[in-house]
Amino acid sequence: MSGTVLVVGSINVDLVVSLARLPEPGETVTGGEFARHGGGKGANQAVAAARAGARVRFVGAVGDDDLGATAVDALAGEGVETGAIARLDGTATGVALIAVDAEGRNQIAVASGANAMVDAAMVDAALAAEPLGPGDVVLLGFEVPDEAVVAGARAAATAGARAILNPAPARDLPDGAREGLLLTPNGLEAATLSGETEPAAAARALARRTGAPVLVTVGADGALLVDGGCIEIAAPEVEVVDTTGAGDALNGTLAAGLAAGRDLEAAARAAVEAASASVQRPGARG
């Protein structure tokens, strides 16, 4: 029987402008096309996990505004269970302003809004309603406060569940969320966390720190999995439209694979394939 993926993470609305090129500091670039998408790393990862076949529960928060209602409805429409998402009075839903160029590269600015209010009590309430089991996977990210991340990590450890931490945006690993977590940074985040600039060296350093495997994404080259040895997972060559959300597709698919009982390398390979597919479509969720 497959386990459940519990995502503790962010929910945003993405406001996207597609441009011929990205602006330099202080520069205005006109002629772009506008679109609005569901976003937030946690929400994107939850959607990816659900599309990969997992049962997905979500712990997070939105504001008491139309954007929040739309964001929650979009998650529910993807099959994500939204009962543990708090609607906070007097708070705005998180928003990301995204510029994407003709090569699919992006610049992103985020107003966290309700995401900054996600706390351990929300995690505890969700787990009181339905505790974790050994086959479950908890997927955590740094777009919500440390206390929520630590609560999710500790609950996973207590239940014997797998915990994945996508340390984005990169910051120091909090006490209580270091040992035993599967880290999934990109190359820049791995370098920031480890002090090592070369991805394989950074992955090994992080694995020594956590005592657990590390999966470092390296863009078009795929990913490096350190689990004892170092395994290179190549990404297929694809035509890139938009790289926004590629890491989220990887993390959600990875969590779904592990919840389904796949071994780590097989789940990681499927996750890289999903990330490669995601960059061929516009928007963080394709």
Predicted features by range, described:
Residues 1-61, 66-77, 240:
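Glycine-rich phosphate/adenosyl-contacting loop at the front of the ribokinase-like
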Residues 1-5, 172-176, 199-286:
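Conserved phosphate-binding/catalytic region of the ribokinase-like
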Residues 47, 95-99, 107-108, 222-226:
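Short beta-strand scaffold segments in enzyme catalytic cores
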Residues 50, 157, 259:
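Gly/Ala-rich phosphate-binding loop of Rossmann-like dinucleotide-binding domains
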Residues 74-90:
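A glycine-rich helix N-cap at a beta->alpha junction
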Residues 123, 135-204, 212, 221-222:
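Conserved beta-alpha-beta core of the PfkB/ribokinase-like small-molecule kinase fold
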